[in-house]
Design a protein with these regions (language model features):
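C-terminal substrate-binding/catalytic lobe of Rossmann-fold NAD(P)-dependent oxidoreductases
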Residues: 1-63
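NAD(P)-dependent Rossmann-like dehydrogenase/reductase catalytic/cofactor-binding core
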Residues: 45-90
Length: 90
């Protein structure tokens, strides 16, 4: 996933990554500072893993974030969790 957005205030790569790291729960969203490639994420159950080494800030307020995922496994895992949640409500 390649996300680019503008912030209201100036930020640094370190600030962006700190916020992403804090927000990553390790279950749905992960965060890594390891130099991995797309094939390293095959079979991961997380919906997305933020690649902190690829975070960029341009002009102080334009931020680019890259995250990786295994579409089949991540989706299947979320679907199974949703099914269990619905079943518990019945």
């Amino acid at each position: 996933v390649d996300v680019v957005f503008e912030t209201e205030k100036k930020v640094t790569v370190e600030e962006v990554n700190a916020a992403l790291k804090e927000g990553a729960d390790g279950h749905v969203l992960c965060y890594t500072e390891e130099p991995l490639v797309s094939s390293d994420y095959i079979g991961t159950s997380q919906s997305s893993t933020v690649d902190a080494l690829l975070t960029r800030v341009m002009g102080g307020n334009q931020v680019k974030i890259i995250s990786w995922y295994d579409n089949e496994m991540g989706y299947s895992t979320r679907l199974a969790e949703t099914t269990l949640m619905v079943a518990e409500k019945l």
